[in-house]
Amino acid sequence: MAKAAAFAENYGIPAYFDDYDEMLKQDFFDTVYTGLPNSLHYPYAKKALCAGKNVLIEKPFCSNLAEFDELVNLSHEHNVYLIEMDRVTSLPNFGVIRDHLGELGPIRAVTIDYAQYSRKYDDYLNGKISNVFTTEFSGGVLSDLLVYCVNYTVALFGKPTNLIYVVDKLSTGIDISGALVMKYPGFIATLTGSKNSIGDKRSTIQGEWGTIMCDTVPSVLKDVDKVTRQGTERISVYEEYDGTTYTLFEMKRIIDNDDRAAGEIRLAQSRKVMEVLQSARKSAGIVFEADNR
C-alpha cells in the first residue's frame, strides 16, 4: 500500500485500494487498465466490465479466443468500451508506413526481428521460474514480444492464409524463442522473436519497387526509411510520445466522443491478432492452462 499511496499522491489520485472488488464499486473513475500477467487479463477485465467500467486491456488481449469473445460480449452487454493497449496502430509512424505501402509495388517479403534478452531467463537458468515463462500465466515470447509484430503485420495486410510457428521451448512448455512464418498471396511474412538471445530489433517490408526499413520494433517505429532505385528517403515523423501515450490519447478520444465505430474497428483488429496467436500456439503445440478451463 505504501507504493500505491506514493503513486496516488504523485498523480493526484483521490483514493487507492488493496481490494479490487471494493475499488470497482467507486464512481470517481470510469476506466480500468489491466496491466497484469497475461492469464489474469480475463478475470480482472471481466469483473471491471460487469461493474460498468471501460477497460484498457494489456497485450496480449487474453489467453485465447473463448476468453476474448466473452469479454467482448460483456462490453456490449454493459455498454462500455474494451480496448487493447497494442502500442502499434496508434503511432503516427504506423500511419506513415501504411500510407507509403502503395509506393513499394507488389509486396514480396516482410521480415521482423525482435530479440530482447530477458533478465528473468537468468533466473530460470538458476532454478527460479518467473510467471512469464509458465503456461499457468500464459507466457512465452509469442505473447510477450511477437504479439507486437503480429499486430503490425495483421494491421497492414490482414490475416494470413496459412502459418507455421517453429519454436524452442523451455521445460515449462512455453516458447523462449520462435519463428512465425505467415503466408500471404504473393509473399511470406517471417517474424522472429527471442527472450534468450541478444540480437536485432528491425523490420522490413519489401516490394518490387522499393523497401520500407525500420531499425526499431513495431511498438516504437522510429527512423523509418523508404529505399527505392532513386535512393533512400527518411519518411518517419517526429513522435513526441511513446506508443502507450498515443494509445491512451486514442482511447480517451473514443470514450469522450462515444465513437462506437472506432471501438469496434479496434476490437476487430484485436480478434484477428488473437486468431493468429491461437493458431500459432496450436501449430507449435503450446497449451496454456487457461485453454483447459
Predicted regions mapped to residue ranges:
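Beta-loop-alpha module in the N-terminal Rossmann-like domain of NAD(P)-dependent dehydrogenases
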Residues: 2-74
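Hydrophobic residues in well-ordered beta-strands that form the structural core
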Residues: 17, 57-58, 82-84, 214
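Predominantly a Rossmann-like dinucleotide-binding segment in NAD(P)-dependent oxidoreductases
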Residues: 91-161
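Active-site loop of classical SDR/Rossmann-like NAD(P)-dependent oxidoreductases
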Residues: 237-249, 265
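Contiguous beta-strand/loop segments that form the cofactor/metal-binding neighborhood of enzyme cores
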Residues: 149-220, 249-257
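Rossmann-fold dehydrogenase core element
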Residues: 70-87, 106-109
